[in-house]
């Protein structure tokens, strides 16, 4: 998980996840597709809060903490990012109301973004909190579907209508084009910072060649 800068990573992760999801919803709202039906008691956030905590921790341990690191050790950061992101996206195709495009979108939004969040910090708390904030904001606060599933109790009961390109349809806002664009921008920034900080690992064969050449 990493012991350094835990509080900083938690705060930054929450802010980033919240902002990315809020921008996604904002686009839907500006296009007239987001309507608030009712505002419910604060206790209504407990079910989606619990779900967001569980899914973010479990999925990040599996995909970034285990799968990504195993692949990265042999094949390097770039190949590991691509493989783990594709697996993450394809697994979500089995979700309700999902599709191949939704899965590919999640590969970019979550797979690459969260993978690079780990690479940048070498700390699981950062991607866990981004993941949590994204799901929590989308479901508990804005009352939207998350990866094809909609909670019955949320802080805001909302209705989302309009072009599925911008709403994500029944899959939820994370299936929208703007969600992919916003997350891709954040991914590019993290890639730049990761390269600048020297956090990118080479494939084992390049490391071996370099060491043999040096010796």
Where does each model-flagged region fall?
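Structural signal for membrane-spanning alpha-helices in multi-pass inner-membrane proteins
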Residues: 24-29, 88-95, 114, 142, ...
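Hydrophobic alpha-helical transmembrane segments
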Residues: 10-15, 45-46, 78-83, 104-105, ...
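C-terminal membrane module of polytopic membrane proteins
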Residues: 137-215
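Small-polar-interrupted transmembrane alpha-helices in polytopic inner-membrane proteins
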Residues: 21-24, 51-52, 56, 76-93, ...
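Alpha-helical transmembrane segments of multipass membrane proteins
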Residues: 16, 20-24, 55, 84, ...
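Juxtamembrane helix-loop-helix connectors linking adjacent transmembrane helices
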Residues: 1-61, 68-73, 203, 210-215
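Functionally important transmembrane alpha-helices
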Residues: 103-164
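Membrane-interface helix/loop boundary segments of multi-pass membrane proteins
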Residues: 58-83, 87, 116-123
